[in-house]
């Protein structure tokens, strides 16, 4: 009506982490990474969301899809892992966390729109990466997801090799994110990196200006 301000379109759009996420195993641990842009339709509603969510001390998940759905799954699994850890009086296994994510994703697959990559370290199997798309559980040496992943499949296929060191995996993750954030309009902001091994869980933020550049930038 005349005299009333029109409601911005993004208010009625679903908020999505429309996104680039990645996780990779190295001998003794894992490296996870994500961009930080959150969008609703064509609007950016958050430029610095951390999409790497802790599920337990040495288990993280990378979030993509609907921000609300992905965060809800992560919070449910975090709670269940805390209870499970108290029951068994030891840290949970990475596969247990991934199985919980898989079960929730499959049970509510008609209602939820989220893809979580679960990665971490445990004493039984060391560093592990699991993809849980649509309720399917697969362990992989590395996994990528989100809208930005379609722009970097060629890069990761060409650059990945088994047996990379921790430092090489960190560089691989950062370069993959930088390329995806340059190509994908729904990815951007800063890069969040988490490195997990037996001895530590290290979180790092790389500002956009500090990300590597490539020949077309």
UniProtKB/Swiss-Prot annotation:
Question: Pfam families annotated for this entry?
Answer: Proteasome
- Propeptide boundaries: 1-18
For this protein, the Enzyme Commission number is: 3.4.25.1
Q: Which UniProt keywords apply?
A: Cytoplasm, Hydrolase, Immunity, Nucleus, Protease, Proteasome, Threonine protease, Zymogen
Q: Which residues form a coiled coil?
A: none
Q: Quaternary structure per UniProt?
A: The 26S proteasome consists of a 20S proteasome core and two 19S regulatory subunits. The 20S proteasome core is composed of 28 subunits that are arranged in four stacked rings, resulting in a barrel-shaped structure. The two end rings are each formed by seven alpha subunits, and the two central rings are each formed by seven beta subunits. The catalytic chamber with the active sites is on the inside of the barrel. Component of the immunoproteasome, where it displaces the equivalent housekeeping subunit PSMB6.
Family of the protein in this entry: Belongs to the peptidase T1B family.
> What is the official name of this protein in its record?
Proteasome subunit beta type-9
Record organism: Oryzias latipes
């Amino acid at each position: 009506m005349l005299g009333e301000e029109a409601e911005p379109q993004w208010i009625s759009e679903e908020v999505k982490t429309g996104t680039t996420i990645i996780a990779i195993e190295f001998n003794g641990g894992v490296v996870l990474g994500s961009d930080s842009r959150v969008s609703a339709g064509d609007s950016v509603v958050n430029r610095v969301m951390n999409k790497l969510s802790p599920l337990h001390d040495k288990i993280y998940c990378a979030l993509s899809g609907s921000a609300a759905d992905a965060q809800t799954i992560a919070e449910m699994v975090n709670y269940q892992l805390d209870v499970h850890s108290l029951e068994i009086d030891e840290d949970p296994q990475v596969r247990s966390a991934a199985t919980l994510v898989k079960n929730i994703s499959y049970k509510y697959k008609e209602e939820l729109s989220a893809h979580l990559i679960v990665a971490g370290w445990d004493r039984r199997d060391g560093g592990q990466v699991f993809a849980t798309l649509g309720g399917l559980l697969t362990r992989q040496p590395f996994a990528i997801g989100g809208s930005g992943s379609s722009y970097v499949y060629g890069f990761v296929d060409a650059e990945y090799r088994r047996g990379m060191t921790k430092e090489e995996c960190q560089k691989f993750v950062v370069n993959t994110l930088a390329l995806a954030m340059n190509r994908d309009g729904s990815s951007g902001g800063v890069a969040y990196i988490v490195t997990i091994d037996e001895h530590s869980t290290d979180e790092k933020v790389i500002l956009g200006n500090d990300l590597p550049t490539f020949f077309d930038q």
